[in-house]
UniProtKB/Swiss-Prot annotation:
It comes from the Eukaryota. This is Required for respiratory growth protein 8, mitochondrial. GO terms for biological process: mitochondrial genome maintenance. Keywords: Mitochondrion.
Protein backbone atom coordinates (compact mmCIF):
# COMPACT_ATOMS: atom_id res chain seq x y z
CA UNK A 1 0.00 0.00 0.00
CA UNK A 2 1.50 3.36 -0.99
CA UNK A 3 2.39 5.76 1.80
CA UNK A 4 1.68 9.48 1.70
CA UNK A 5 4.36 11.97 2.46
CA UNK A 6 4.35 13.66 5.89
CA UNK A 7 3.73 17.11 4.44
CA UNK A 8 0.63 15.82 2.62
CA UNK A 9 -0.88 14.61 5.92
CA UNK A 10 -0.05 17.94 7.53
CA UNK A 11 -1.68 19.84 4.68
CA UNK A 12 -4.88 17.82 4.95
CA UNK A 13 -5.13 18.41 8.71
CA UNK A 14 -4.48 22.14 8.61
CA UNK A 15 -6.89 22.68 5.71
CA UNK A 16 -9.81 21.33 7.72
CA UNK A 17 -11.84 23.84 9.70
CA UNK A 18 -11.73 23.25 13.44
CA UNK A 19 -14.98 25.13 13.89
CA UNK A 20 -18.04 22.91 14.11
CA UNK A 21 -20.76 23.85 11.64
CA UNK A 22 -23.80 25.41 13.23
CA UNK A 23 -27.01 23.42 12.99
CA UNK A 24 -29.20 26.47 13.61
CA UNK A 25 -30.84 28.15 10.66
CA UNK A 26 -30.46 31.88 10.20
CA UNK A 27 -33.98 33.24 10.41
CA UNK A 28 -34.54 36.81 9.29
CA UNK A 29 -36.81 38.65 11.69
CA UNK A 30 -39.52 40.80 10.25
CA UNK A 31 -38.95 44.57 10.58
CA UNK A 32 -42.53 44.71 11.83
CA UNK A 33 -41.24 43.04 15.01
CA UNK A 34 -37.77 44.55 15.37
CA UNK A 35 -38.48 48.14 14.31
CA UNK A 36 -42.24 48.40 14.55
CA UNK A 37 -42.11 52.09 15.44
CA UNK A 38 -41.05 52.85 11.85
CA UNK A 39 -44.27 51.37 10.56
CA UNK A 40 -46.68 52.79 13.12
CA UNK A 41 -49.11 55.46 12.07
CA UNK A 42 -49.26 54.20 8.49
CA UNK A 43 -52.33 52.68 6.90
CA UNK A 44 -51.37 49.28 5.55
CA UNK A 45 -53.55 47.64 2.91
CA UNK A 46 -53.84 44.10 1.62
CA UNK A 47 -54.10 43.78 -2.14
CA UNK A 48 -55.82 40.92 -3.96
CA UNK A 49 -55.86 40.06 -7.63
CA UNK A 50 -59.52 41.00 -7.91
CA UNK A 51 -62.66 41.61 -5.86
CA UNK A 52 -63.61 37.98 -6.46
CA UNK A 53 -60.51 36.89 -4.52
CA UNK A 54 -61.74 38.79 -1.47
CA UNK A 55 -65.04 36.91 -1.58
CA UNK A 56 -63.33 33.63 -2.43
CA UNK A 57 -61.47 33.60 0.89
CA UNK A 58 -64.66 34.33 2.81
CA UNK A 59 -63.45 37.75 3.97
CA UNK A 60 -65.77 40.63 4.75
CA UNK A 61 -65.45 44.29 5.57
CA UNK A 62 -64.54 44.38 9.26
CA UNK A 63 -65.29 48.13 9.48
CA UNK A 64 -62.20 48.72 11.60
CA UNK A 65 -62.61 52.54 11.55
CA UNK A 66 -65.77 51.89 13.62
CA UNK A 67 -63.87 49.72 16.11
CA UNK A 68 -62.59 51.55 19.19
CA UNK A 69 -60.00 48.91 20.11
CA UNK A 70 -58.71 48.67 16.54
CA UNK A 71 -58.20 52.43 16.46
CA UNK A 72 -56.29 52.34 19.76
CA UNK A 73 -54.09 49.47 18.58
CA UNK A 74 -53.36 51.36 15.35
CA UNK A 75 -51.97 54.37 17.24
CA UNK A 76 -48.19 55.01 17.02
CA UNK A 77 -45.95 52.84 19.20
CA UNK A 78 -44.16 54.42 22.17
CA UNK A 79 -41.81 53.05 24.87
CA UNK A 80 -43.28 52.97 28.38
CA UNK A 81 -41.01 54.83 30.82
CA UNK A 82 -40.64 52.20 33.57
CA UNK A 83 -40.71 48.89 31.70
CA UNK A 84 -39.45 50.08 28.27
CA UNK A 85 -42.13 47.95 26.65
CA UNK A 86 -43.29 49.32 23.31
CA UNK A 87 -47.04 49.90 23.44
CA UNK A 88 -49.57 51.82 21.30
CA UNK A 89 -49.60 55.30 22.82
CA UNK A 90 -53.39 55.36 23.26
CA UNK A 91 -52.87 52.88 26.13
CA UNK A 92 -50.38 55.21 27.87
CA UNK A 93 -50.36 58.56 29.68
CA UNK A 94 -48.28 61.24 27.99
CA UNK A 95 -46.17 63.39 30.35
CA UNK A 96 -44.44 66.70 29.69
CA UNK A 97 -42.55 69.37 31.60
CA UNK A 98 -44.25 72.77 31.88
CA UNK A 99 -42.80 75.97 33.29
CA UNK A 100 -44.48 77.34 36.39
CA UNK A 101 -43.94 81.09 36.16
CA UNK A 102 -45.02 81.65 39.76
CA UNK A 103 -42.38 79.45 41.40
CA UNK A 104 -39.91 79.48 38.49
CA UNK A 105 -39.74 75.67 38.29
CA UNK A 106 -40.56 72.98 35.75
CA UNK A 107 -43.55 70.83 36.69
CA UNK A 108 -44.24 67.33 35.42
CA UNK A 109 -47.85 67.09 34.22
CA UNK A 110 -50.06 64.80 32.17
CA UNK A 111 -50.49 66.08 28.62
CA UNK A 112 -54.14 65.34 27.96
CA UNK A 113 -55.03 67.84 25.24
CA UNK A 114 -51.82 67.82 23.20
CA UNK A 115 -50.45 71.12 24.55
CA UNK A 116 -46.78 71.48 23.61
CA UNK A 117 -44.38 70.80 26.46
CA UNK A 118 -40.80 69.69 27.13
CA UNK A 119 -39.32 66.22 27.61
CA UNK A 120 -42.13 63.98 26.38
CA UNK A 121 -42.39 60.52 27.94
CA UNK A 122 -45.10 57.89 28.44
CA UNK A 123 -46.21 55.88 31.47
CA UNK A 124 -48.84 53.20 32.09
CA UNK A 125 -52.44 54.38 32.11
CA UNK A 126 -53.20 52.60 35.38
CA UNK A 127 -53.50 54.23 38.79
CA UNK A 128 -52.48 51.18 40.82
CA UNK A 129 -49.29 50.66 38.79
CA UNK A 130 -48.35 54.32 39.11
CA UNK A 131 -48.92 54.34 42.85
CA UNK A 132 -46.43 51.47 43.18
CA UNK A 133 -43.81 52.86 40.81
CA UNK A 134 -43.66 56.37 39.43
CA UNK A 135 -41.07 57.65 36.95
CA UNK A 136 -37.72 58.88 38.26
CA UNK A 137 -37.59 62.66 37.78
CA UNK A 138 -33.80 62.78 38.23
CA UNK A 139 -33.43 61.61 34.63
CA UNK A 140 -35.29 64.65 33.33
CA UNK A 141 -32.53 67.18 34.02
CA UNK A 142 -31.07 66.76 30.53
CA UNK A 143 -34.44 67.26 28.84
CA UNK A 144 -34.93 70.93 29.60
CA UNK A 145 -33.50 73.65 27.32
CA UNK A 146 -30.10 75.09 28.16
CA UNK A 147 -30.45 77.58 31.00
CA UNK A 148 -27.98 79.08 33.45
CA UNK A 149 -28.80 77.99 36.05
CA UNK A 150 -31.19 75.15 35.01
CA UNK A 151 -34.66 75.22 36.50
CA UNK A 152 -35.46 72.66 39.21
CA UNK A 153 -37.95 69.94 38.28
CA UNK A 154 -40.94 69.27 40.52
CA UNK A 155 -43.16 66.17 40.28
CA UNK A 156 -46.01 65.84 42.76
CA UNK A 157 -47.35 62.36 42.02
CA UNK A 158 -50.64 62.83 43.91
CA UNK A 159 -51.34 66.19 42.28
CA UNK A 160 -50.40 64.88 38.82
CA UNK A 161 -52.70 61.86 39.04
CA UNK A 162 -55.54 63.90 40.53
CA UNK A 163 -55.28 66.45 37.72
CA UNK A 164 -55.26 63.65 35.14
CA UNK A 165 -58.34 62.04 36.71
CA UNK A 166 -60.20 65.37 36.66
CA UNK A 167 -59.30 65.88 33.01
CA UNK A 168 -60.60 62.41 32.12
CA UNK A 169 -63.92 62.91 33.90
CA UNK A 170 -64.34 66.42 32.47
CA UNK A 171 -63.68 65.15 28.93
CA UNK A 172 -66.07 62.22 29.43
CA UNK A 173 -68.82 64.53 30.67
CA UNK A 174 -68.36 66.85 27.69
CA UNK A 175 -68.49 63.96 25.21
CA UNK A 176 -71.54 62.46 26.93
CA UNK A 177 -73.47 65.71 26.42
CA UNK A 178 -73.03 65.17 22.65
CA UNK A 179 -73.76 61.43 22.73
CA UNK A 180 -75.79 59.97 19.87
CA UNK A 181 -77.84 56.92 20.80
CA UNK A 182 -79.30 54.44 18.32
CA UNK A 183 -81.99 51.78 18.20
CA UNK A 184 -79.78 49.41 16.20
CA UNK A 185 -78.14 46.39 17.82
CA UNK A 186 -75.30 45.16 15.59
CA UNK A 187 -71.50 45.07 15.31
CA UNK A 188 -71.42 48.82 14.62
CA UNK A 189 -72.97 49.68 17.99
CA UNK A 190 -71.79 49.65 21.59
CA UNK A 191 -73.99 48.77 24.55
CA UNK A 192 -73.37 50.62 27.84
CA UNK A 193 -74.83 49.15 31.01
CA UNK A 194 -74.30 48.69 34.76
CA UNK A 195 -74.51 45.19 36.24
CA UNK A 196 -73.22 43.46 39.37
CA UNK A 197 -74.11 40.00 38.06
CA UNK A 198 -70.77 39.52 36.31
CA UNK A 199 -67.22 40.84 36.55
CA UNK A 200 -66.78 41.20 32.81
CA UNK A 201 -65.53 44.58 31.73
CA UNK A 202 -66.26 44.00 28.05
CA UNK A 203 -68.09 41.35 26.10
CA UNK A 204 -69.79 40.82 22.75
CA UNK A 205 -73.45 39.82 22.63
CA UNK A 206 -75.15 37.52 20.13
CA UNK A 207 -75.98 40.47 17.85
CA UNK A 208 -72.35 41.50 17.60
CA UNK A 209 -72.55 44.62 19.77
CA UNK A 210 -69.63 45.43 22.06
CA UNK A 211 -70.99 45.50 25.63
CA UNK A 212 -69.20 47.61 28.26
CA UNK A 213 -70.04 47.13 31.93
CA UNK A 214 -69.52 50.40 33.85
CA UNK A 215 -69.96 48.86 37.32
CA UNK A 216 -66.28 49.30 38.25
CA UNK A 217 -66.35 53.09 37.75
CA UNK A 218 -69.86 54.06 38.89
CA UNK A 219 -68.40 56.33 41.58
CA UNK A 220 -66.39 58.19 38.92
CA UNK A 221 -69.08 58.72 36.29
CA UNK A 222 -70.83 62.07 35.87
CA UNK A 223 -74.20 61.99 37.66
CA UNK A 224 -76.29 62.38 34.49
CA UNK A 225 -74.47 59.57 32.73
CA UNK A 226 -74.68 57.23 35.73
CA UNK A 227 -78.41 57.84 36.10
CA UNK A 228 -78.99 57.20 32.39
CA UNK A 229 -77.15 53.87 32.13
CA UNK A 230 -78.41 52.63 35.52
CA UNK A 231 -82.06 53.01 34.52
CA UNK A 232 -81.63 51.05 31.29
CA UNK A 233 -78.79 50.00 28.96
CA UNK A 234 -78.17 52.36 26.06
CA UNK A 235 -76.83 51.63 22.58
CA UNK A 236 -74.64 54.13 20.78
CA UNK A 237 -73.06 54.29 17.35
CA UNK A 238 -69.39 53.39 17.61
CA UNK A 239 -68.26 55.55 14.70
CA UNK A 240 -70.23 58.66 15.68
CA UNK A 241 -69.08 58.53 19.32
CA UNK A 242 -65.43 57.52 18.92
CA UNK A 243 -64.09 60.34 21.14
CA UNK A 244 -66.47 59.36 23.93
CA UNK A 245 -65.56 55.66 23.69
CA UNK A 246 -61.84 56.40 23.62
CA UNK A 247 -62.08 58.52 26.79
CA UNK A 248 -64.33 55.94 28.47
CA UNK A 249 -61.89 53.12 27.70
CA UNK A 250 -59.02 55.24 29.05
CA UNK A 251 -60.98 55.82 32.28
CA UNK A 252 -61.75 52.10 32.63
CA UNK A 253 -58.08 51.21 32.11
CA UNK A 254 -56.91 53.82 34.60
CA UNK A 255 -59.08 52.47 37.44
CA UNK A 256 -58.71 48.79 36.55
CA UNK A 257 -57.56 46.52 39.43
CA UNK A 258 -57.93 49.27 42.01
CA UNK A 259 -58.85 48.40 45.59
CA UNK A 260 -62.52 49.05 46.12
Amino acid sequence: MPRLERNVYKGLITSLSRKKPSNSLAVKESPLLTKFERWSGKRMKLFFESEDSFEHYGLRDLKLPHNMLANKLASPIRAERNTRYRIPKEFLIKLNLYKDATNNVLQLKANFNGVTGLGTTYIHNNKKCLEMKFCDISRWSSRQPLKVPPLPIVADKSALLKDYENQLIRELNECFSKLKTTSKHDHNTVKLYVSTENNLLMDVDTQGSLCINLQSITDKLPHTMLETVTNAPIHISAYSNMDFLTTLHRLLGYYRHRNR
